[in-house]
Design a protein with these regions (language model features):
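Rossmann-like NAD(P)-binding element
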Residues: 1-12, 20, 29-32
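Residue-level signal for pocket-adjacent positions within structured domains
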Residues: 7-8, 13, 77, 92
């Protein structure tokens, strides 16, 4: 399920909750980065936890998405450490690329154009999972 990012979900996946998981668990996050404590995740990966991890979003990714950085050094410590693990893949916000998400973006874009023209408040796109 898609989990919204708020105070109740901040670091929902942490040392304590990871300890409850089987070592062979597969962890996938396509919701919000701050749901997973990256330091706890890295500690667990170092200890052999997780069969596989797929992160479309992660806390601290800020300047590492939507830009080709294939010819520069990774300066973000969390990104660099996450990429060390062969069982982990970073997908850089590709989960948004669904028909529903693109349709919601297109609808809100058109509504915003109309609202701007009429002097009304602008909205934002939200795709319900």
């Amino acid at each position: 399920p898609l989990i919204m990012g708020d105070n109740g979900t901040y670091h929902l996946i942490n040392d304590e909750t990871i300890a409850l998981m089987k070592d062979t668990v597969m962890l996938v996050n396509t919701s919000r980065g701050p749901i997973i404590d990256p330091e706890a995740l890295i500690r667990a990966l170092k200890q052999g936890k997780f069969h596989a991890v797929a992160l479309d979003v992660y806390e601290g990714e800020d300047n590492n998405v939507y830009t080709d950085k294939s010819d520069v050094a990774i300066t973000n410590d969390i990104t660099a450490r996450l990429q060390m693990f062969p069982q982990l893949v970073l997908t850089s916000h590709q989960a948004f690329f669904t028909r529903e998400a693109l349709q919601a973006i297109a609808v809100v874009t058109m509504e915003n154009a109309r609202n701007f023209n009429e002097g009304n408040e602008l909205g934002s796109a939200e795709c319900k999972a």
